[in-house]
């Protein structure tokens, strides 16, 4: 059996997820090996899934991907000749230390849903609450809904307070979810793949919150056997919210000028 120290080394990722530098560089016969440049080159040569599995200790089930990146819609810019019907956001707050607070922001044109921004951060609530408030103000969001899990009620109230203190008014409410998370994600997946548009990968930086959000979304499997599902779950909550608003009700939530 591996000792705990050996086990930690065995699980260590080739590139540090924060610094993007090699965790394994050393000198062999006067030559540096397993350098940052080497691992970054491998990352360019392999698919994201292969690299994550082989070098970053993140195995996945390729055949069971629910949101395969090749099946999603992407955009470079919003439609220039149309005014959106509304701009909304849905927040899924972290329930445990390793979870991420996930809040996608959607600009809606008819049935088309453009995910223009996200808060996706595993930092504590005192960090993510101001992040959410700033994101909602910046994107001129008309209304935001937070899942009323253990702390969601208080979280939403605090975000609303921060926004009010900065002189803005955004409709914020909480909503309790009773459906099974995995079922909810599966049910929403068809509409997400058909009508949701995500920022093209060339338009944001590797390691950004949007990048981490998309990475978690596109490696989620149908079996649900993944370390985290905050990104797909927040999108499923958003899809559900949009369905509730549709049918002539969207104009009620026109964004503030």
What label would you give each PLM region?
Residues 18-91:
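ATPase catalytic-site recognition across NTP-hydrolyzing enzymes
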Residues 142-156:
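Extended C-terminal subregions enriched in glycine
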Residues 73, 80-81, 105-146:
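Nucleic-acid-processing active sites and adjacent nucleic-acid-binding tracks
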Residues 1-10:
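Single conserved hydrophobic/aromatic residue that forms the stacking wall/gate
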Residues 95, 120, 150:
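Short, glycine/acidic-enriched loop or turn micro-motifs at the edges of active sites
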Residues 14-16:
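Conserved AAA+ ATPase "SRH/arginine-finger" region at the nucleotide-binding site
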Residues 82-108:
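Gly/Thr-rich phosphate-binding beta-strand-loop-beta motif of the actin/hexokinase/Hsp70
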Residues 49, 53, 57-58, 97, ...:
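C-terminal nuclease/phosphodiesterase catalytic domains that cleave nucleic-acid phosphodiester bonds
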């Amino acid at each position: 059996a591996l000792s705990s120290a050996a086990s930690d080394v065995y699980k260590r990722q080739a590139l540090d997820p924060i610094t993007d530098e090699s965790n394994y560089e050393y000198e062999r016969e006067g030559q540096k090996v397993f350098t940052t440049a080497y691992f970054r080159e491998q990352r360019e040569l392999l698919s994201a899934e292969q690299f994550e599995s082989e070098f970053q200790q993140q195995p996945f089930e390729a055949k069971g991907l629910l949101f395969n990146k090749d099946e999603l819609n992407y955009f470079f810019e919003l439609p220039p000749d149309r005014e959106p019907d509304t701009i909304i956001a849905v927040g899924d707050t972290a329930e445990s230390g390793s979870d991420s607070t996930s809040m996608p922001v959607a600009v809606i044109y008819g049935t088309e849903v453009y995910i223009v921004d996200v808060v996706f951060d595993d930092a504590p609530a005192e960090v993510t609450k101001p992040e959410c408030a700033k994101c909602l103000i910046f994107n001129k969001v008309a209304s935001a809904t937070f899942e009323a899990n253990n702390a969601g009620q208080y979280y939403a109230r605090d975000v609303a307070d921060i926004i009010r203190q900065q002189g803005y008014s955004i409709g914020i409410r909480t909503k309790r979810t009773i459906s099974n998370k995995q079922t909810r994600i599966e049910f929403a997946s068809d509409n997400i793949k058909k009508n949701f548009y995500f920022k093209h990968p060339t338009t944001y930086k590797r390691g950004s919150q949007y990048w981490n959000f998309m990475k978690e979304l596109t490696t989620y499997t149908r079996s649900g056997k993944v370390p985290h599902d905050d990104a797909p779950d927040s999108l499923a909550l958003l899809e559900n919210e949009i369905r509730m608003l549709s049918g002539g009700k969207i104009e009620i939530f026109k964004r503030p000028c």
